[in-house]
From Swiss-Prot:
It comes from Staphylococcus aureus (strain ED98). A zinc finger (C4-type) spans 4-21. Residues 1-49 are cytoplasmic. PANTHER family: MEMBRANE-ASSOCIATED PROTEIN TCAA. It comes from the Bacteria. The lineage of its organism: Bacteria, Bacillati, Bacillota, Bacilli, Bacillales. It is a single-pass membrane protein. GO terms for biological process: response to antibiotic. Its main location: membrane. Keywords: Antibiotic resistance, Cell membrane, Membrane, Metal-binding, Transmembrane, Transmembrane helix, Zinc, Zinc-finger. The keyword Transmembrane helix applies. Belongs to the TcaA family. This is Membrane-associated protein TcaA.
Amino acid sequence: MKSCPKCGQQAQDDVQICTQCGHKFDSRQALYRKSTDEDIQTNNIKMRKMVPWAIGFFILILIIILFFLLRNFNSPEAQTKILVNAIENNDKQKVATLLSTKDNKVDSEEAKVYINYIKDEVGLKQFVSDLKNTVHKLNKSKTSVASYIQTRSGQNILRVSKNGTRYIFFDNMSFTAPTKQPIVKPKEKTKYEFKSGGKKKMVIAEANKVTPIGNFIPGTYRIPAMKSTENGDFAGYLKFDFRQSNSETVDVTEDFEEANITVTLKGDTKLNDSSKKVTINDREMAFSSSKTYGPYPQNKDITISASGKAKGKTFTTQTKTIKASDLKYNTEITLNFDSEDIEDYVEKKEKEENSLKNKLIEFFAGYSLANNAAFNQSDFDFVSSYIKKGSSFYDDVKKRVSKGSLMMISSPQIIDAEKHGDKITATVRLINENGKQVDKEYELEQGSQDRLQLIKTSEK
């Protein structure tokens, strides 16, 4: 359709004269318009054919861009670069994140120790070179799945392994630091409190028993800690160094503000060695000149005394106080007994014992003869006066005599004797009827006019 330029009447394209006003249309203009419309239609067809190709090309460009973006952040080389940058920049939080596993959480302080250990024991330049070479070889290898970076001394410091793929195209590299167990072996039951894996941790170790305190990645550690024992609470550090271990464990050195006490006794020569005790802060312990007592906190005073027995009597020293300001890691102290008082008492008791022993020697000499006579004559009356009537021993001997089962004895020797009120305990060495030497313990009662009678006996 076209419009008459004179009257505006609509007419078909092939009409030459306007039916309204008689205006004659220009045939060349119609031809041009027809040609132009055909060109536009042709161009539209071409454009419609090009759109899918353009879209495809655009998507391809996007895929290529996305691939390179993913490659920059997910290729083995990119993963390596992330770890290297974190170590180079002392980014302990990033290193902690990269090294943490489900089984072993690494905190930032542990990562800080690890970074320093790498720089000291491998060297940053060497570490970066070893890491890149290791990743490259693993990435190219069809068989190898893991390898270790080592220190100059040959200790493993980082495990690099393949762990599946990322986005189909890239090997996923896993970086894991090997761990060891630091171990403690306290002299007494001890509770340790410290921070590990970003959390507070408590470990209770029994006396003289090897106890691990956790799993740690390589490093030289000085961990702030508190420890508690029966002697008190201590502030200090747990120290351990991976360079000092070639096994799965590493010994812990304790560095706490503590004092150990060495005790020397004077004036104690007359005391029984087994009876000597040391009391520190109200806690009594056996004494040994070679023993070190403790540890004790250095921030509190210590009270100390000693005791011991001689002839059944307990003697004590004066109680001394060691001020906190005088406490050192190794602290020596001397405690003095009143040797003159002890010697006077021992001398007095020895005289009494000699008198008692003489009485017992006389008594058991007569008793052994009476015992043997009762056996030979089957007559309890021979021995009855030596045994207290009504006692279980009296009835037992009487029964044995009647049955002919009484044992003959000879050569009694008094080994030891003690008197407590009217009761006497004596250890007597005898020869039995089989010719064997036996020690028996007798209990006697001292009655009126110092008369002695047996009330009990037992094998020593």
